């Protein structure tokens, strides 16, 4: 993979988009590498993923305008589908994904961050959907995920105006979960990833599935999804071990595999 690098720290994998000279901008090759990186994750041992960009200026500054400038309608639609396919894969990936936003997260960069479960940013981060200023719409889910995260009115304001916002405003409107000084970002992201990784993996996976599946359903159907996933945790090693240790006041030892047994 020419534009993405990976590093494993215990049960946490760090996936880094590595195109700093272009501010980690997305093009078809970067998207293909990102897809390959997620497909290569060892789901038997990894319990949390951290996604970030190389350098201290940019998470992902957007899609590569140079490569888009000559696209036809058909090519533009195909590029949108490529990005959406990759981002949907990340959004539905069984393992939790934290976006460590270390600078610019504009256009496709903001859309990529929004496809992650949790967004934590540095104090120099900048977010926005500037596409209408370039004569296009957001193409990788920006009009959809932004409204779900910050509400329809705020999403429309940001998209229609092409306004960029700083880290503190992104936190205020609920786009990010936390803001840290640049030098402390990865330390705090990895601390959270470690806390997630220590919990029972089957239960964490089922929680992600329940939230993602249920959010678009009527509450009556959504709780049915939760019921099945709740029931699916029983008779697993983690459930037996966790409850036995709770009752005996011992520290539980969640199993490192994701199979129900």
Describe each region flagged by the PLM.
Residues 30-33, 79-82, 112, 185, ...:
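Hydrophobic alpha-helical membrane-association signature
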Residues 53-89, 105, 135, 218:
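Glycine- (often His-adjacent) and acidic-residue-rich active-site loop
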């Amino acid at each position: 993979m020419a534009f993405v690098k990976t590093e494993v720290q215990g049960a946490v994998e760090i996936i880094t988009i590595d195109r700093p000279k272009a501010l980690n901008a997305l093009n078809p090759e970067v998207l293909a590498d990102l897809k390959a990186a997620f497909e290569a994750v060892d789901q038997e041992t990894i319990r949390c993923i951290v996604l970030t960009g190389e350098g201290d200026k940019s998470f992902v500054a957007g899609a590569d305008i140079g490569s888009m400038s000559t696209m036809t309608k058909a090519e533009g639609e195909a590029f949108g589908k490529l990005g959406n396919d990759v981002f949907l894969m990340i959004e539905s990936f069984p393992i939790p994904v934290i976006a460590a936003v270390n600078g610019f997260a504009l256009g496709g960069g903001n859309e990529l961050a929004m496809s992650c479960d949790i967004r934590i940013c540095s104090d120099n981060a900048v977010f926005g959907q500037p596409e209408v200023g370039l004569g296009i719409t957001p193409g990788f889910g920006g009009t959809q995920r932004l409204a779900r995260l910050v509400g329809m009115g705020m999403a429309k304001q940001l998209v229609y105006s092409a306004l960029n916002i700083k880290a503190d405003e992104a936190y205020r409107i609920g786009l990010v979960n936390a803001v840290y000084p640049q030098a402390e970002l990865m330390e705090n992201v990895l601390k959270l990833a470690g806390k997630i990784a220590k919990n029972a993996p089957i239960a964490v996976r089922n929680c992600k599935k329940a939230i993602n599946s249920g959010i678009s359903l009527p509450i009556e159907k959504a709780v049915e999804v939760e019921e099945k996933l709740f029931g699916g945790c029983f008779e697993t090693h983690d459930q037996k071990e966790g409850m036995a240790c709770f009752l005996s006041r011992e520290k539980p030892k969640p199993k490192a595999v994701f199979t129900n047994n």
